[in-house]
């Protein structure tokens, strides 16, 4: 199928959605993390063009990137959005980073009308401290910060997403993370989307009824492999990468997908 971009209205929210791949075969949904955009999967997307045997879907989730803002950002709202994108897909494969990974695990419960074949995650935070929750509460209530130039906003985007040493502000990815209004620029993400930090990862994981792969970069400062292993002793460490493993080493993330989905190289 031809690679295409569309705006899908789901639950009254306009979501930016990119699709590509092949008409026949399994469906793969890739979900970004907090403050990110679908373009963060650019490196993985290049591999999919050659190796994924079916269709792939990469959205900007509500309140992020080129999608519209919302009044609600609970993890269940994101899961319902993603389930709607997967309408008609049989046993889709789900892959997500951080927040997107947790959305995938919630979809593995079967409560949203889909039955994933497997869910592959990297960097899903397990436990939040009181101090971390206080920091998120401050972020949620913070007024919008406007910048005088596009480049200043892009620099802020790569900083808050933890990509400063990996992605250039001049990149296509950074462009998708900022918006302009009346000659000023801001981050595209709605700060209220940080409410996902109040989701209980352990409860959500316990409700999963489909196989879930848990992984984290060995340099991930958000979550350690040891913390993930309190959920699943088989949780994997990814060598040489940090929280944004899918950006730092797209091939390593693809190998997680291929292994879990039974795709032979």
Please state what every model-predicted region is.
Residues 34-46:
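The serine-hydrolase catalytic nucleophile loop
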Residues 148-199:
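Conserved alpha/beta-hydrolase catalytic His-Asp/Glu region
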Residues 241-254:
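Catalytic histidine-centered segment of alpha/beta-hydrolase-like enzymes
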Residues 181-230:
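Conserved serine/cysteine hydrolase catalytic core
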Residues 96, 100, 104:
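Gly/Ala-rich beta-loop-alpha elbow adjacent to hydrolase catalytic centers
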